[in-house]
Amino acid sequence: MKHLDYSAPGEREAGERTWEVVRAAFEERLPSPRKRDWRPFALAAAAAVVLAAAFSPPGNAVFGSLRDAVRGERNAKPALASLPAPGRLLAESSAGIWVVQNDGSKRLLTGYRDAAWSPHGLYVAAVHGNELRALEPNGRVHWSLGRTGRLRNPRWSFDGFRVAYFAGRSLRVVNGDGTGDRLLTRDVRPGPVAWQPNAHTLAYVNRAGDIEISNVDKRNRNATVQTRAAPGQLDWASDGKTFIAVEPHAVEVFSQRGPRIGGLDRGIAQMSAAAISPNGKRIAFVETRGGRSTLQLTGVLGGPTGPIFAGAGTFANIGWSPDGRWLLLDWRSADQWLFIHSPVKKVLAVSNIRANFGADSRIAGWCCP
């Protein structure tokens, strides 16, 4: 079946205006513009039932067959030649973790998984077998720590002096030099964890599905924040005053020890990822509805919400560049990474991600100038 590509007259121009309006509202704190209708246009193709999703700037979504065929961005580069902003990437695959330099050169650290950058990108915390290791981006190991149970999701504190990680069904903390390993709690759901900036305070999800805020050095300074559904992701604003929790159908915004102070409920749409911008003002999030995913932008403390990019299939995860001017979107179904620039709309697409990084590769972090 031939795949048809439709766009309504003037639609891309209207999309560009929306991008500028949303961006300006956050950067200049202008009043919210009149809400526009961005629902895709349904068009009939001869001899077949074909849905063509409308352009949502700066990309497009094409539903050209009953199988929701996915076509990525045109003019995509066949490989990642360089990053569009200062910094380095971490990507994970079943073969190990990839360290991608600013010039596009990359190194595979075989056998590692669950990787995270340290502050300033000097080290990587990662799991190798039954060991938690701290290593340089060139693979040189500085320390290792063996533990029973499945190790996962290590995360550095803001100053690099603490590393939190899961071992089996417990949450543990070790000093940044590999000493002083200790149990923090067993009342935890292994998965999301996030350090508050400028503090040794950790946010995690307890067995009941609520969020615990715990100072790992002063154990009597704890708080419990109730949620509507167990979050799958936590992220702090850079000033440490607010954090977000990504629930199955919502993004909730909380003050540093509760309560809820904002957020978005997206109804039946599935929320798959969200990230706060480096300046702490904006939230980029991905929602999926009816086989179509949309990257959207909103304010941490309210303001307009607008689409940035939409496409058929799955957007796996997102990340901000260290300078906050680019968003990296993993368009899993199209086998592409998209670097999306703000405030001037621009998309740089890279194809063949599975061939270059592995069939199950994912973005783990974009760190440090």
Regions found by a protein language model. Name each.
Residues 3-5, 13-19, 27-30, 36-45, ...:
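Sequence signature of WD/YWTD-type beta-propeller architectures
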Residues 22:
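Hydrophobic "lid"/C-terminal helical patch
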